[in-house]
Each structure stands twice: as C-alpha cells, then as structure tokens.
C-alpha cells in the first residue's frame, strides 16, 4: 500500500457543547481514493471540515505528509494543496462556468494548461462555458464544483457526497470522471452515501459511527461482505442493485 499522504490520530472535535469526533484514527494513502462512509450523523462532514481547519480539533493530530496541520487555519491548509468540494458545491450561481473557474485559478488565469486539465476530466463543461452556473443541472453543477477544486494541481481533494440527489445515469457519468481523476494520481477523500458509487470508486475505506472510526480496510473487501455492510452501514440487499 502507498505511504499515507494524510494521517488523523486521536482527533476530537467539539462544536459548542457537542463532542462530535471522538478519537478519529485513519490515514489516506497517496494516490488513492479513500471512501469515508457511515450513517447520517456519524461525523463524516465534520471530519472533512476539521481536516480543512473550518473546525478546530480539540485533541489529537492531523498530518499532511510530515506537516502538522492540526491547528493551522483554512487559508494556510488550502495553500498546502488541499481542496474541498462541500455538499453545497460552493459555486457562484450568477457567474458563468468560465468565471467560476477563473475565480478558482491562481491570479484568475485560465491558461491552456489549466483548461486542458479541466476538460480532460469534464469535457462536457465546454458546452456550457458562458452559461450562468445557476442554470446548470445538478450533475453539471457538481462537475463544475469539482473542476473548481482541481483547476490547480492538488495534493488532496476532499469531496462531500457528490452524487447526492443525482439521477443514476448522471451518477454513472460522474463516476467515470472521478475514475479518470483518480488515474491521474490525485489523492481523494470522499464522503458518500451511495454504495454503488463507493464500491465503484473506492480503494480504501474508513467507516464512522457516532464520531468514531469503527472499520478501516479495502473497499473491495467491504463490497464483497454483505454481512459486514449490514452491520456497519445498515445496508439491505436492495442497496446492491
């Protein structure tokens, strides 16, 4: 297995009086797509936000390679090569696709290298280049949101539930694009509720429950063990269709 790019050790996060993350331990291998799974309210999104510094860990450590980023602020963490695609997507509805991407590029420069990178993974965006982002479909908005995150090369991309609310055919298109992104060597940590997408994309997996990591391993092994899926995720047989 590749060496870890990101390592969380004993991470705790409090939000107000609530103890959300309780000793979270797992790592994200370099060049792999790691799925972060769990039932609603398990702490998955809080984990992503804590990695990015949007919430501060109250105990434990987070390392990006050898750098301790536990108490770093969000701009500093982003400058180290971590990008975040929130569930809300974070796009500007009144701006065109081109303008959204230019805002995400350094100095607003969409040069040929950046355009080639975007269109390699999401060629469909060419058709909507000058269209306001608010007029895009859900799947197109998700493609734009991920493109904003990768317009510059990143060490790590955090993605929160990219398939939520999308039709099955659109999910399959998004899976294909993310597989290509993974093949490029981009390291990804993804929260996902759609088990088909998780099974199709994941190399490694960490499963959360009540703010704790209750399982780590390879996604292929979890996908092959329906009993383990039921115990960890509450999945029934119809979830595999």
Regions inferred by a protein language model and the residue ranges of each:
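The feature captures the beta-strand-to-loop junction immediately N-terminal to the Walker
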Residues: 37-39
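Helix-to-loop junction immediately C-terminal to a conserved catalytic motif
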Residues: 52
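Conserved ABC transporter NBD signature motif
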Residues: 60-68, 80, 113-114, 120
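Conserved ABC ATPase signature
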Residues: 132-136
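A short, proline-enriched helix->beta-strand linker immediately N-terminal to the Walker B motif
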Residues: 151-155
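Catalytic Walker B motif of ABC-type/P-loop ATPase nucleotide-binding domains
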Residues: 157-161
